[in-house]
Each structure stands twice: as C-alpha cells, then as structure tokens.
C-alpha cells in the first residue's frame, strides 16, 4: 500500500479521530465500546430484564435495532412527512423475550425515540457517539453476511452468485460512514455503483440539476472508495475511467462487473473487525471492566478475550442444532463469513462446517413463530487461538475452491494458500474485450492468468495462543488442502430480505 501515509487506520475512521498514536486510538475505541456497554446496561434496567434475559442475543439485537432506528434521521424525517397507518414516527420498538414460569414469552415493546436518544447520549458522555452506532451496524452486517445469501441481489445487477465472497457489508446502511466503507467488499460497492448507473439510464433527470450534482459527487466518491480497495495499477486505472465517464451507462456497468470478477483473483483490500453484540460489552462493563482505561482494539486479541469469558444465550428453535447456532454467531462476531473454513476452524478449535450443512436458521425470530416451543442455550463463542484481523485481500494461488463460492476473502492474518477455482473464474472473461478499457482489461487478464502459487499466497503472521497477548510467537498452521474451504459451498440458506 503505497499511500499508507494518507490512510487513516480503521480505528481512526471508527472514532472519527485525527491522527492519533496507538495508545490514543486504543483509548478512543475503548471509550466507544464502553459507551455501548453502559447504554445496554441502562436499557436492561429500564426494561426490567433479568440478568439471564439481558444475556439473550435476541434481546440484544432488539435493543441495538431500537437505538439505530432512534438515530436514523433520514428515515425519521421521511416517516414524519409520510405518515403511514399504525406507525408512530416518534416511537420505536421490537420483541423482548422474557422467561415466565419456565417458558419464553415474547413481549412487543414501544419506546419514545427521544427517550432512547437520551439514554444513549447519557451513556456516551452527552455525545451522539456516531462511531458506536456504526459499530453496531457493522455487527448486524456481519451477522447478515454469515446468515443469508445475496444470490438474488447479485443476479439482479448482472453478477454471478458464486462471487459471494466479494459481498461483505452488502446490507450496511448508507449512513455507516468511513468505517462502514472500509468493511465493504468489492462486489458490494460495485453493486451500489451499478444500481446508480441503472437509475441514470432509466431516469434522465438523475444526473441533472442541483440534485444531480450531489448524485454525481456521491458517484465519484464511491468510485474512489472502490479504486482504493484495488491493489493493482490496471484495476485502479479502469476505475478512473468509470469515474470520469461523462454519462455513465452500460459500458461502465460492464467494466464494473469485469472489475468485480477480477477481484476474485486480484483481491481488493477489505477491512475486517470483530464487532460483538451489545450485551457482551454490557456484561463486561457491569463486571467492572473499564474499556477506556484498558484500551481496546477491534482487530487484535481484545474481542477474543472478551468472548472467552462472556456467557451469551440464544433462543433455539425445536429442530435447530445449538452447536451450529454457535458457529453462526462466532463467524459473525469475527467477520469471518467469507474466510476459509479451515482457517476459522483452526482458530476456533472446532470443526467449522459449510453453511449448507448447518442445521440452524438465522438468529432473529419472526413475529409469527411460536416462542413457547423454544428453548435457550449457551452460545459457545470461545476460541482456541487468536489471530490479527486483516485489511488486505492478500493474493492467491491455484487451489481447489468449491462449486458454491469460487474464492475466499481472508479475515485473519494467517499465512496460507488462498483457494480459488481458476478455470471457473477465467471462463467468465471470454468475450467482450474491446472499447476504451481494452488495454487495461488485457493487462488484468494477463495478471490473473499468471497468478502463480508461490508468489501469490497470503503472507500472514500466523495464529497465537490466547496467553500470548503481545503476539510474539506465531504458530503457522498447516491445512489439509484437499478439504472443502468455503462456507457457501452447496448453499441452501435463506435469501436476505429487507
């Protein structure tokens, strides 16, 4: 990364901070985490949740969604201007699950958004603490990435469903800022751009007038974000072309799909952060942990240590496997939906199975499901080792990947080969190679074809014992490369529907 000097670290993006040294960054991230924890404790008090109920991940998600909704200014404004029957724009709520006479009961609660904003600000030293809100959004996004497939969304924009490893962060709201942009995959941003271009094709006023000027600025900004994720000059040059186009249309859509595909081999830099449910931070604060004083990092050992001694519960449907539910949440906590299963399994110290083999649906429970028939069980979120989260895509060598997902996006900085199915990826590049980007396309295809095993594996650090907090003795795991490495293999998960 040549431009390292101009890049702010995630943690700075995360906390909106200026240049800070490592200790200051750890302190400001700690302040953000502590604020989420204090908010959660206060909400549990207001809702009169027992200790057990406060540790229920479904309750945590409801409380998290309420605070996100309370601060969603654009939507709040929209709701006030377009009143719909039965929706009070000033209130927010959701299902809270309580244990009554040995059974779980669902209670729908409603709360003033103003009241929730007050509790949140009070927990965050009177500030709006947008960094904390973004952090919660990223946790929800990571949970969606591990739970749902985006096949329909990919197909709609003309991409191939097997490119799912590029779709990290595809459900993040627009308002998630720089920290949100850092964790979005190449496919996610390409898809947002394609949607914009399609609107421009169908609506001639899209790029015109005062609004159109703002749209254009957003378009160019998004192009620059995507350009910044690519690591090769040819990919970046092609992004310049897309950005500078006077009147973006089908040629640009083609270019974006081409670039997204190329990222399966010439991977982009996508940040990974471990964002945990609010109840985990609440438990730690309640037990006297001072995050700001101790400092905290989203990409180091801290989240692993936190999960080692947190007990979180989840409702389990009658035919679900609690171990599988735990795996789903573990992957979400570490942003590992697109990581090689062998790496995740080694770090976790348990076999990690592909999603098609999981006997579990999502964590959230629909309003028409019968809660009384459900039990709760402890989520096993501990790990055997820890590893630093990566922000680079690494590079790849030739290796078998699978039918459902033809590449991985590394989460952990662990040295290994990265699987991808060269024949499948390259087959997509036959055909259209003329026009203004032809020389760049040729160059990109040449780089992909010459992707050699030895120079293109992912150079990581290795994993560490949990007692090795300073990351001094890396253990480089060896993986059985004949095994299946991707999570989305033979997939049968539900689609993500807003």
UniProtKB/Swiss-Prot annotation:
Keywords: Capsid protein, Helical capsid protein, Host nucleus, Host-virus interaction, Ribonucleoprotein, RNA-binding, Viral nucleoprotein, Viral penetration into host nucleus, Virion, Virus entry into host cell. InterPro entries: Flu_NP (IPR002141). Its main location: virion. Pfam families: Flu_NP. Residues 8-22 have a biased composition (Basic and acidic residues). Late in virus-infected cells, may be cleaved from a 56-kDa protein to a 53-kDa protein by a cellular caspase. This cleavage might be a marker for the onset of apoptosis in infected cells or have a specific function in virus host interaction. A motif (Bipartite nuclear localization signal) lies at residues 198-216. The keyword Amino-acid biosynthesis does not apply. GO terms for biological process: symbiont entry into host cell; viral penetration into host nucleus. It is found in: Virion; Host nucleus. Residues 1-22 are annotated as: Disordered. A motif (Unconventional nuclear localization signal) lies at residues 1-18. GO terms for cellular component: helical viral capsid; host cell; host cell nucleus; ribonucleoprotein complex; viral nucleocapsid. GO terms for molecular function: RNA binding; structural molecule activity. Encapsidates the negative strand viral RNA, protecting it from nucleases. The encapsidated genomic RNA is termed the ribonucleoprotein (RNP) and serves as template for transcription and replication. The RNP needs to be localized in the host nucleus to start an infectious cycle, but is too large to diffuse through the nuclear pore complex. NP comprises at least 2 nuclear localization signals that are responsible for the active RNP import into the nucleus through cellular importin alpha/beta pathway. Belongs to the influenza viruses nucleoprotein family. Homomultimerizes to form the nucleocapsid. May bind host exportin-1/XPO1. Binds to viral genomic RNA. Protein-RNA contacts are mediated by a combination of electrostatic interactions between positively charged residues and the phosphate backbone and planar interactions between aromatic side chains and bases. This is Nucleoprotein. It comes from Influenza A virus (strain A/Swine/Tennessee/24/1977 H1N1).
